Amino acid sequence: MGKGLALDIGGTKIAAAVVTESGMLIGRQQIATPRGGAGQLAAALETLIAPYRHQVDFIAVASTGIISGGRLTALNPANLGGLADFPLYDCIRSISDLPCVLLNDGQAAAWAEYQALGDKNDNMMFVTVSTGVGGGIILNKKLLVGQRGLAGHIGHTLSDPHGVLCGCGRRGCVESVASGTAIGAETLGWKQPVSAATVFDMAQQGDAQAGKVINRSAAAIAQMLADMKMALDLEVVILGGSVGLAVGYLERVVAAQKTLPGIYRVPVQEAHHRQDSGLLGAALWARTSL
């Protein structure tokens, strides 16, 4: 099929790269995800797509949110600056008439990471801990998308029934406890609130308060993995996202798993493709779909 342009729309950034037939990413770039509504998102997509209209054969998009019927619907609109619904396919087709395939970003990343594992596993899951918490599931060697595109929205499984209200409208979702947004929100009661990135820096320097906040996130992820292992008989979990790939986070998740009975534990490893799993996965999926 030749080269494709892959896009990865996240809550914090939109990344783009040309993906060759051999799976190499060329000219990777990223911009901040606009927070000003549909018009700004459309303009950002045009900025990234327009220069490549005559250089690639297809467009592949991995995006946060529910991807169904060509639309992006946000379970937690706060992750996209309040944008709840966006005609993603129509927007891209208005910029370019190239063939276009859309997929949820967690699903796309799961597909790329599954390919990287080789043919060793039947059931695996990709987990992204970033602005929000999401994922993608491979079951019996097949990517689980779902009739409505919901499969893999593991950040909206329950962590604490008495917890804070999640942006999706339910109380105590994993995302409201474990995400980068939640980590930052935990510092609002501090003398000087800081970002999630700063919390990790503080923890690296031995700050006990910062370490406690990160441990709470890691424990929520470990409990969620235990639930998903029991539901899906997972063989391995791949961890990604800005929080998931932060120094020391994987080790904290593994430590939290060790407090559970052995049957609830599942091997966890960092994403092979790091921050590019979504880009590559979208392109790989498009090649199977077009």
UniProtKB/Swiss-Prot annotation:
Entry-linked PROSITE patterns: ROK
Major enzyme class: transferase
Catalytic activity entry: an N-acyl-D-mannosamine + ATP = an N-acyl-D-mannosamine 6-phosphate + ADP + H(+)
EC id: 2.7.1.60
Binding site for ATP: 6-13, 132-139
UniProt xrefs under Gene3D superfamilies: 3.30.420.40
Keywords: ATP-binding, Carbohydrate metabolism, Kinase, Metal-binding, Nucleotide-binding, Transferase, Zinc
Matching Pfam families: ROK
Cited InterPro entries: ATPase_NBD, ManNAc_kinase_bac, ROK, ROK_cs
Domain of life: Bacteria
Binding site for Zn(2+): 156, 166, 168, 173
A GO BP entry: N-acetylneuraminate catabolic process
Pathway: Amino-sugar metabolism; N-acetylneuraminate degradation; D-fructose 6-phosphate from N-acetylneuraminate: step 2/5
Single GO MF annotation: N-acylmannosamine kinase activity
Family per similarity comment: Belongs to the ROK (NagC/XylR) family. NanK subfamily.
Protein purpose: Catalyzes the phosphorylation of N-acetylmannosamine (ManNAc) to ManNAc-6-P.
Assembly information from the UniProt record: Homodimer.
Protein name: N-acetylmannosamine kinase
Gene responsible for this protein: nanK
